[in-house]
Amino acid sequence: NNTAMQKTVFTKEQRAIHKLIVDSIGMSDIGLFDGKMGIILSLITYSRNTKHKAIEEVADFLMNQVLNNMTNISPLSFSNGLTGIGWGIEYLIQKGYMPGCGADICSEIDKKLMSCDIRRVDDLSLEHGIYGWLHYIVAHIQGANRCGKQVFDRMYIIDLISKINEY
């Protein structure tokens, strides 16, 4: 019977989404550039644009994995560390894709970031340095303002501005 053997044809976009989902299964990296947070952003955007609820559920499942494992990673880098994950969380909240307040969800990230003496950081790169941290810090302050919260103390902001002014 030929109708029972019909082949499903997927678009390039659908194949890419399916590959992301399969790749995420055994993935240990939860970061933004090469990990689960980056995949979550792709899946959420796709699911909202296509109204594909199952894809959104996969993204929610992955987000729970990220949130449960955030405290297990220590790099502050934007590419594969905490500031990239925090930026992703803020992006999802501010776009209305995720409920909550980033100030509450990312408080541990903020503590780790403020415990680092920014005056001694020499890396300015997006991937691992201050430029990446700034992406998180600016988005996070915007999100915190919407929640009526303050996320960084005055001294940290003064040191950050001072460091930026060096360059």
Task: Describe these PLM feature segments.
Residues 4-61, 165:
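Low-complexity, Ser/Thr/Pro/Gly-enriched N-terminal "stalk/linker" regions
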